[in-house]
Design a protein with these regions (language model features):
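Extended alpha-helical surfaces
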Residues: 1-165
Length: 165
């Protein structure tokens, strides 16, 4: 349905700076999508298949992370049973404990990215692909401007400010 628009979108890769911003994507999408699909996309309406599936995945992911934290802090963890199970989350969470917080955040976002790929592997030109692309773009934008050099500068300036007090 959205063949031309989908085909014109630049490729996104996890961990790389995206070639366009979310605002630019939304402006292009507004010209290409039906008004109904545009509203659903920008609202991340769970009635759209990708957004509904990602909401369930995200709830499961966050619940499992909260359970792991509660277990680590020896706190009671009385969480509701999820409506769906995602083995890839359970398998990955055990390995994430060894990572530093920044690496862990990237690994969790990679889980999200892979789930989006799984949801749209057979729909490269439809509305589901457009919705998944928008979520991936949001994930990629989160890391825009983040790099070790910039992080080191902020850290060094914070240490200097604390030393001067």
């Amino acid at each position: 349905m959205y063949d031309f628009f989908s085909a014109s979108l630049p490729e996104l890769r996890p961990g790389e700076t995206p070639p366009l911003t979310l605002a630019e994507f939304d402006a292009d999408a507004e010209l290409q999508l039906t008004p109904r699909h545009y509203r659903m996309m920008t609202a991340e309406d769970p009635a759209a298949r990708v957004y509904g599936a990602m909401r369930r995945f995200e709830e499961y992911l966050r619940t499992r992370i909260a359970e792991k934290r509660a277990e680590k802090l020896k706190m009671p963890a009385d969480f509701a049973e999820p409506e769906a199970f995602y083995g890839e989350v359970d398998a990955a969470l055990g390995q994430l404990a060894q990572l530093d917080p920044a690496e862990r955040e990237r690994a969790v976002d990679l889980l999200r990215w892979k789930k989006l790929d799984e949801l749209t592997w057979n729909d490269e030109f439809g509305f589901d692909h457009i919705c998944a692309y928008r979520v991936k773009l949001r994930l990629a934008e989160k890391y825009r401007g983040r790099d070790a050099g910039t992080g080191r500068k902020f850290f060094d300036s914070a240490v200097r400010a604390m030393a001067e007090q």
